[in-house]
């Protein structure tokens, strides 16, 4: 009875291999037998052999379809990428967009005095949220509204900070 069970297991593996690799059943059986019925080994062998020229899948594998990984016209795409220059785009509009670019890329240097008093308490909350999620939840909402427009948001947030953390309010007022 174990022979029939082994045959059944082998037939199931062959069918699964055909569905996974998209090959013929006789090729799947040969690969699985060569790999001593180890599915992953046979599958790896199949996909490594598709690069060998005698494989009947070779033409289909080497001529990719127009997928997101292959652009429609590769030389034109290379030409467009070669024309892009990141340094010129940042320095070209540097007069009006450089403060916004620096605040978007690195907010702490843009607000060094306002973040100086909160640098120590805010980093541990980001590093260890599971430790005390109820204690650390009030701090991120106070931190996120500040960077967009500090002059208009700080006075409405100052009374909220005074009620939640009395020592945070004087530090923010002193830095302002």
UniProtKB/Swiss-Prot annotation:
Q: Which InterPro entries match?
A: UBA-like_sf, UBA_8, UBALD1/2
Which segments show compositional bias classed as Low complexity?
A: 120-137
Q: Where is this region: Disordered?
A: 87-176
Task: Please name the SUPFAM superfamilies in this protein's record.
Answer: UBA-like
CDD domains in the record, alphabetically? UBA_F100B_like
Which ranges are annotated Basic and acidic residues under compositional bias?
166-176
Locations of Pro residues compositional bias?
A: 138-150
Family, as annotated? Belongs to the UBALD family.
Query: What PANTHER family does the record tag this protein with?
Result: UBA-LIKE DOMAIN-CONTAINING PROTEIN 1, UBA-LIKE DOMAIN-CONTAINING PROTEIN 2
State what protein this is by name: UBA-like domain-containing protein 1
- Give the organism, scientific name: Mus musculus
């Amino acid at each position: 009875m174990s022979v029939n069970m082994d045959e059944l297991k082998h037939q199931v593996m062959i069918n699964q291999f055909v569905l996974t690799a998209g090959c013929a059943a006789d090729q799947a059986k040969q690969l699985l037998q060569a790999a001593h019925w180890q599915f992953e080994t046979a599958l790896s062998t199949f996909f490594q052999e598709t690069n060998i020229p005698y494989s009947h899948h070779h033409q289909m594998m080497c001529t990719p379809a127009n997928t997101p990984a292959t652009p429609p016209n590769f030389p034109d795409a290379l030409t467009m990428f070669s024309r892009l220059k990141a340094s010129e785009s940042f320095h070209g509009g540097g007069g009006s967009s450089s403060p916004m670019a620096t605040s978007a890329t690195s907010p702490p240097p843009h607000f060094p005095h306002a973040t100086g008093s909160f640098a120590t308490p805010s980093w541990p909350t980001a590093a260890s949220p599971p430790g005390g999620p109820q204690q650390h939840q009030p701090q991120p909402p106070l931190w996120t509204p500040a960077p967009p427009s500090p002059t208009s948001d700080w006075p409405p947030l100052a009374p909220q900070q005074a009620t939640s953390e009395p020592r945070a309010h004087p530090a923010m007022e002193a830095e302002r």
